[in-house]
């Protein structure tokens, strides 16, 4: 394996490990993630792996917002929007999640649609970039939400385990949104997509 390929591989493992340690509640899985983290550290200590400057494996990096992606997919008549039901609270979201380290924003959005909505899509345009905590006081990590509009491609397949179901909802009868989203922002993004606008904070 080329050295650069090894570094890319370790970055991906580190990304998965950090995500697992943050979100997993299974003690066996948590233990496995910690062991993986230790193995990555041991490999990074090898003399032939040199990481220059700030990188994913260092802790003292400049604090910066997290980035998530969301995608608006309308029905063919543009009277309904595709939403997914989150297992965590049995409420609804636009397909989406955290942006991936090794993908650009639109690729991350397509990946989330594939996993959560269970379909391929073609990204058609940028709808907006919003600050999730804009005008809200919080001690949490800031989050920027990048939203795209897309067209569904092909047939549906089974969504990932995080999703209970997917469904098109009429635009005048949207359900309650999951607590992982701000409902006012999700509605703003859907409206902007429908009207061909671009919104931002």
Regions found by a protein language model. Name each.
Residues 17, 37-40, 117:
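Long alpha-helical scaffolds
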Residues 53-93, 121, 125:
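N-terminal strand-loop-strand
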Residues 27-70:
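Acidic, metal-coordinating catalytic segment for phosphate/diphosphate chemistry
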